Amino acid sequence: MEKRQLYSSQSQSQPLNIITNTINSRPSLLRKPASSSSQSNDRISYPPSTDSKFIQQQYHQPLLTNTDIKLEDIESSSSNNNPLKNSINNVSMQISQLNSSHHSRALLMQKRNNPTTNIRPTVKKKLDDTHKPLTSNFKKPITPISKLNTNMNNNNINNKNNNININSNNSSNSNNNILSPVQNNTISPNSNLLNSSIKFEKSNFFSTMYSSPTTITTTSTTLNNDNNNNISISSSCSNNSSFDLQQQHALHERMNKIDQFTQTVRGNLQSQFDNISEQLKPPRLSLSIQDIKTRLDFEEKNKEVEKIKLELKNVLQSLKEKEKELMEAHYKVSQVSVLKDNMERDLQQSNQMILDLQHEIRSSSLKAIQVDEKFNNMKDVTKDLDDEILRLNQLVRERDTEIESLRKENRELLEKSRSDEKVRRKLHNTIQELKGNIRVFCRIRPDFSSGQGANGSVFNIPAGTDNLVEVKSPTIDSFNGEASIKKSTFTFDRVFGPSSTQELVFEDISQLVQSSLDGYNTCIFTYGQTGSGKTHSILGDLKVPSQRGMIPRTVEKIFSSIQDLTEKGWTYQIECFFLEIYNETINDLLNTTTTTTGGNSKSNEIKYEIKHNPDTNVTTVTNMTVVPVTHPSQVYELLNLANKNRSVAKTLCNERSSRSHTVFQLKLIGYNQQSSERTQGLLNLIDLAGSERVSRSGVEGKQLKETQAINKSLSSLGDVISALANKEQHIPYRNSKLTFLLQNSIGGNSKTLMFVNISPELKDLQESTSSLRFAAKVNSCELGAARKQKII
């Protein structure tokens, strides 16, 4: 909006500028030119002359300027007493009077040009002297008006309502140069130095001048330069279209150039005219009274004209200031209008916000009422809860007192439990010693053949007993040849029949497992012929929980007992290794780089050596793979790996016969944080190779050598047992690797359990009887009291 008002003000001020420039640029001889000293070199110099008639004849124009200003039907929206309109009318009347004075002066100049005047030769001579330089000065090229018109047409100023035509039809200026008025060394008396006619045609200029500042006007100006040098300026204002800012700027530049050109020509002409007037001025005494009066009138009129021009300039300046004030007022009004609109919009928003807030206040009031109701209800509930909290706090205090009492009692019980644990261990060890540090269990394998069962004529367990086994062996009397049944009875610590389960067998073994947790060395080994069920008793089927043997069940029992002992402050570290003695050679079954399959040993030449520590009574094997375990599943994986690496072969007695002795050892290291007590126990689970006669097993070659090595080691074990039973001074432990490894287990520093496994089949009667006799010999041995392991 501000931009539109500024554009309108520029459009309105343009006609005023055109009027001012036209009046100021009027080439009148009445105006005093600038001093001749400040004139540039391109000013036009007229030849001096004193003969006005001669000048009129040369130029064919009147000496003075005839100026007619016609103001016709000035339409304005203002009243008739408009000061600008009255000022312009006064200027028009004064200029008309001045024109009449110009004509009278021309007549006076013509009277002076009579035959009696003797200054004509002098004028002609001076004109001849100055003709050449005058012509050369007028030859300077000036930009033609027609060219300006062409440029303006190229800028699309030929619009219907925005049209500025500048036509130059001066026939005397065909070369687009201003020539000297001197022709043939004479000055035409009928020529006008400058004859201008300024006409203000009927227009809407003054009406638009006082119209609304937002109206954008268009000015159409036509400058016509004819043969008489008449300049007609016509201005009209229209409300239908507007100047483009860029085109208007270009138009103003061209108008300024035209004004400068007009000022330059006017100044040059005035300067030359003054020079000519001075040269043509007759002697003072030669002027008549009428001429002096005319000259004085001329000077008066000139002063009046200058005064009128000054008044007009002041009026125009005042009008511009009023227009500027009006524009500022309109701008302020527009700002106030915008501010008003903004305030109204803000007021509407504020009213809407007030309505919303009132609605929220009403809603909040309802909610506050509801909250108050809930608060009152909550106060009642809170009061009840406070009472309940007081009651519960009292109950908690009572419970705390009771808990503290129970904790105290628990600490006392724990202390008593630790002392009872010591008593239990002592009593448990005493019971095991009373039972014997070496005990023998007998287990009869179920009969898988079609012959007599174990409860038949071969083996029988008397009713009401669990430690006797009767052997019914058919015999033939050598004296009379009669067949008879010979009965033999063997007594052991416990006898298990063919129907005994793995769980039942392990119940009595678990007592020895507890001894190993208490810090004692324990040893459990199986003995019997091939196929009597030794491996089944010691390992069983790991995939079927009910068929698991002593080793898996022992591991489960140990971890279960450790869990119970943890509550009493005990922590345990468990390590294990698994080895075999094959042909008097020790192999590590947990070492993946050493494998034995079918009796073919593939070793990486690692040497294993058995060492006994007499101070701690601990037996170790060098270079053995010791694996720490924390869960029974880890032990199962190790057992599977050991079974794959164990040496087995097919014989006549067993399709898969163990060809080596295996030793599985668990080291149990315990520590009690409360009592700082330390224990270290060893549990050896040994599966001996099957004892068999060479003639019956039918082995040859390598298997024959294996059988001989097995029988030798078992014979050495029998010799050791016999020496212990007979309490001999020298015990032959070093006769085999097996006896040397079991030195601390069967030599009086360990709790030992021997399982003798027998086959119920009649064909195995002789081998079973031999195993029973060997077990009875072991059972008759008396070992010294077992001692706890020393912790270093």
UniProtKB/Swiss-Prot annotation:
Database matches in PROSITE patterns: KINESIN_MOTOR_2
Chain intervals with Polar residues compositional bias: 34-50
Major localisation: nucleus
Pfam hit, one: Kinesin
Molecular function terms, GO-annotated: ATP binding; ATP hydrolysis activity; microtubule binding; microtubule motor activity; plus-end-directed microtubule motor activity
SMART domains xref list: KISc
Top-level taxonomic group: Eukaryota
Kinesin motor domain: residues covered: 437-781
Protein name stated in the entry: Kinesin-related protein 2
Name of encoding gene: kif2
